[in-house]
Amino acid sequence: MSSLLAADLMPPGPGTLSDLVPAMGQALTGGGPAGLGLPDATRYVFLLVDGMGQENLEQFRHLAPTLSEMENCHDLTCYVPSTTATSLSCIGTGAVPGRHGVVGYTFRAP
């Protein structure tokens, strides 16, 4: 088994689930530059398909041709643990798991 090196880890940064709602809010309100490179728009549609993942979409694109051919789609990185509860909390709060406290199907009480 190989050792995990710091270089193997992805540092937090633009392009995570917690960046999505703040980026849309900034773009819609003019409250700063739109993060994530969102196009100018008066409204956005956010579609979540739980558990799909970009790799699954690429592998099974013949089963979801409409989703596979959508333009202006961006890959977003989820945090660890990559559970639905943690990911939805990141999207809804714009915060990382250590900040919002939902770490899997348990939560950290302040």
Locate predicted features.
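Active-site nucleophile/metal-coordination loop of metallo-enzymes that catalyze phosphate/sulfate
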Residues: M1-Y44, G51-P110
